[in-house]
Amino acid sequence: MFDALAERLEQAWTKLRGQDKISESNVQEALKEVRRALLEADVNLGVVKEFIAQVQEKAVGTQVISGIRPDQQFIKVVYDELVQVMGETHVPLAQAAKAPTVILMAGLQGAGKTTATAKLALHLRKEGRSTLLVATDVYRPAAIDQLITLGKQIDVPVFELGSDANPVEIARQGVEKARQEGIDTVIVDTAGRLQIDTEMMEELAQVKEAIAPHEVLLVVDSMIGQEAASLTRSFHERIGITGAILTKLDGDSRGGAALSIRRVSGQPIKFVGLGEKVEALQPFHPERMASRILGMGDVLTLVEKAQEEIDLADVEKMQEKILAAKFDFTDFLKQMRLLKNMGSLAGFIKLIPGLGGKINDEQLRQGERQLKRVEAMINSMTPQERRDPDLLSNSPSRRHRIAKGCGQTEAEIRQIIQQFQQMRTMMQQMSQGGFPGMGGMGMPGFGGGMPGFGGGAPAPQPGFRGYGPPKKQKKGSKKKKGFGL
């Protein structure tokens, strides 16, 4: 997402490089590139015109700070305006003073509404809120079955009355059921249409009137481009939305919908979908999204994703093994699977400042393939070989057997083992506080040190940043999650 937009904006900054100040004349070329970039990203034309006018006014009237180049100052102006357009700050879901909180989901067919409903339920369950899903889509074949299947997958109950019942009555009874059972939140999945029509809007209005929702969330497919603006406007004028969920941002969408929805409706984007898995839903933070658009990464989201997967106790054990030079292939496999659990390699890389626009899709695909090869190699080892990598260094017959087991050459196996040994040694030295100034090393496939990725430097693991070992937890203290820094 936003790759083409980020590349285009990079061209805009070059128009101001070498200038000693921002003026009415020299900013025009940069603004043309920004305008072209936004239009190619499918941002609504009216939003683009307003955006450019605001940037021009602020850029020309801004005093360039001593030591800051004009192109850097211009980037700051564009960043601030992007944040402003997308809503300034994250807007959390409403929560009723008296349970249940009722959330009505709306949107066109194919936008991913039912999946987004389940994703939202899982997000709330992780926050400790009990949730009930209500299936009112009685028109689409298997829509109710789909929601029931997703509900079982995330361990959230689903209320339904079959495909012959009235959607308004299903919604009303579902909310009442939640009230009787003391459930915190009800999420009502409604029927979609291939296009907006009077019948659809009338039914939505009746459901809304019957259940008086605290949130009306419009699910928007980010791949519909400029139509996102008119779609949002139509739903807001007829139903009155309180926010939006933008889906499929991990695909080939240009991302322009993210810049149009708030400005057109005045209502915030509250979540974005970044994959098909039910875990692939993130709260929308305008300042973080602006940072991604400008190729500056998103460290906070990276940290949050890691905190969900990393346990402090595991970090301490791993650090102790590294200090004792006992880091083995079993540990390495755990680290690889941790990376997988955090999402795709492409999504992970693009959250890292400075890397998002530097690594092309082919390199990312190569990195993904190599991760699979290394995992296959480790899976072909015996438990003893995983625990003692030196066995493989000294035994050609073991390497031959592993190569046959994972479909790779003996030379490839030998190279991966050598790189692993180098990585293990350097990780031990780095965890003891050595190797200053080695930032940027260790990215899989890009000159870094994960075995099989074309380099001997170590891949920095969460918690191993050249600091001393973390302090031991006191007995009885609550287990914490995080990097262990």
Swiss-Prot record:
Biased composition (Basic residues): 471-485
EC number: 3.6.5.4
Region (Disordered): 452-485
Binding site for GTP: 107-114, 189-193, 247-250
Keyword annotations: Cytoplasm, GTP-binding, Hydrolase, Nucleotide-binding, Ribonucleoprotein, RNA-binding, Signal recognition particle
A GO term, aspect molecular function: GTP binding
Cystine pairings recorded for this chain: none
GO BP: SRP-dependent cotranslational protein targeting to membrane
Cellular component annotations (GO), alphabetically ordered: signal recognition particle
Localization per record: Cytoplasm
Keyword Metal-binding: no
A Pfam short name: SRP_SPB
Catalytic activity: GTP + H2O = GDP + phosphate + H(+)
Enzyme class: hydrolase
Family annotation (SMART domains): AAA (SM00382), SRP54 (SM00962), SRP54_N (SM00963)
Subunit structure: Part of the signal recognition particle protein translocation system, which is composed of SRP and FtsY.
Family stated for the protein in its record: Belongs to the GTP-binding SRP family. SRP54 subfamily.
Function per UniProt: Involved in targeting and insertion of nascent membrane proteins into the cytoplasmic membrane. Binds to the hydrophobic signal sequence of the ribosome-nascent chain (RNC) as it emerges from the ribosomes. The SRP-RNC complex is then targeted to the cytoplasmic membrane where it interacts with the SRP receptor FtsY.
Notes concerning its domains: Composed of three domains: the N-terminal N domain, which is responsible for interactions with the ribosome, the central G domain, which binds GTP, and the C-terminal M domain, which binds the RNA and the signal sequence of the RNC.
UniProt protein name: Signal recognition particle protein
Gene: ffh
